[in-house]
UniProtKB/Swiss-Prot annotation:
Its EC number is 2.7.7.6. In plastids the minimal PEP RNA polymerase catalytic core is composed of four subunits: alpha, beta, beta', and beta''. When a (nuclear-encoded) sigma factor is associated with the core the holoenzyme is formed, which can initiate transcription. Keywords: Chloroplast, DNA-directed RNA polymerase, Nucleotidyltransferase, Plastid, Transcription, Transferase. It comes from Daucus carota (Wild carrot). This is DNA-directed RNA polymerase subunit alpha.
Length: 353
């Protein structure tokens, strides 16, 4: 455990980690201060930071398990001490750390007798187990246990739909994509009268997939991303001189869909429309955001080739973006999008290969 003496700056706003400890591999604690703040500022920052820590940070979980030998979720298997339901609950508790976008596959294939733990999960290189000792199942006989797993990175909660008699032996698992287990803030006031100031104390507990300091940094970045749109003045966006940045939105074929948006008779101030208003899936939104694409204008200033060059971007992501443009901004794409991307053939082949 590391604990430092709290010293307060009288000039520049500063933050500092004053205490940190790891109770075990799946429980980290950190205590931070931010000062000096004017009266009321500590509560403003503390409330928003706590919500961002608990709700805006992505985590990685096992969301589905598949085995053809399982008749239903509440069955028991010969040679395995736990029921299928117990195994699924144990898989739900596995803590993972990753740089994953979207979903990926993993597997378990173990022969008994013996214990099956998290270290037996066969993972892609960009996913790792935080605690290899986490228990999954106990094999009491020389049988083989093989389970296919789906791993997903997301935020918030994923509640499974009832699926007790899956025909293909695939069972969804409730997921809690929350690396931060708890977060609290408290305020210490000092000074008198008009010189009264505040110190904000933030306490963060994580599950080990992120350290408290990493969680604090990520929550701060997410809050900044949410507030960036307010840095663009409304008049600047809506009253552009000489129709600058006005982009036409006509009907067009899929082959030229992004390039020809600028030729529509219906013009809009696209610089004022942000991509987070467009119901984009989190994976696509995060890919665009990491490529500095924040507004619809930014999006339309990129060609199909540019979008396909974005890391982890796929041809179906481009199609999904176009579907959302059609739905939300009255862009008529015709009956069925065409697949003729001659200029993108090499890029698509290289991504699929």
């Amino acid at each position: 455990m590391v604990r430092e003496k709290v010293t307060v700056s009288t000039r520049t706003l500063q933050w500092k980690c004053v205490e940190s400890k790891a109770d075990n591999k799946r429980l980290y604690y950190g205590r931070f201060i931010l000062s000096p703040l004017m009266k009321g500022q500590a509560d403003t920052i503390g409330i928003s930071m706590r919500r961002a820590l608990l709700g805006e940070i992505e985590g990685t979980c096992i969301t589905r398990a598949k085995s053809e030998k399982i008749p239903h979720e509440y069955s028991t298997l010969v040679g395995i001490q736990e029921s299928v339901h117990d195994i699924l609950m144990n898989l739900k508790e596995i803590v993972l750390r990753s740089n994953l976008y979207g979903t990926c596959d993993a597997s378990i294939c173990v022969r008994g007798p013996g214990y099956v733990t998290a270290q037996d999960i066969i993972l892609p290189p960009y996913v790792e187990v935080v605690d290899n000792t986490q228990h999954i199942a106990s094999l009491t006989e020389p049988i083989e246990l093989c389970i296919g797993l789906q791993i997903e990175r997301n935020r918030g909660y994923l509640i499974k739909t009832p699926n007790n008699n899956s025909k293909d032996g695939s069972y969804p698992i409730d997921a809690v994509f929350m690396p931060v287990r708890n977060a609290n803030h408290s305020i210490h006031s000092y000074g008198n009268g008009n010189d009264k100031q505040e110190i904000l104390f933030l306490e963060i507990w994580t599950n080990g997939s992120l350290t408290p300091k990493e969680a604090l940094h990520e929550a701060s970045r997410n809050l900044i991303d949410l507030f960036i749109p307010f840095l663009h003045t409304e008049e600047e966006n809506l009253h552009l001189a000489n129709n600058q940045h006005m982009v036409p939105l006509p009907p067009f074929t899929f082959h030229d869909k992004l390039d020809k948006l600028r030729k529509n008779k219906k013009k809009r101030a696209l610089k004022s429309i942000f991509i987070d208003q467009s119901e984009l899936p989190p994976r696509i939104y995060n890919c665009l955001k990491r490529s500095n694409i924040y507004t619809l204008l930014d999006l339309l200033n990129n060609s199909q080739e540019d979008l396909m060059k974005i890391e982890h971007f796929r041809i179906k992501d481009v199609k999904q973006i176009l579907g959302i443009l059609e739905k939300n901004f009255s862009i008529n794409l015709g009956k069925k999008p065409k697949m003729g991307f001659e200029s993108l053939a090499q890029l698509i082949d290289s991504k699929s290969g």
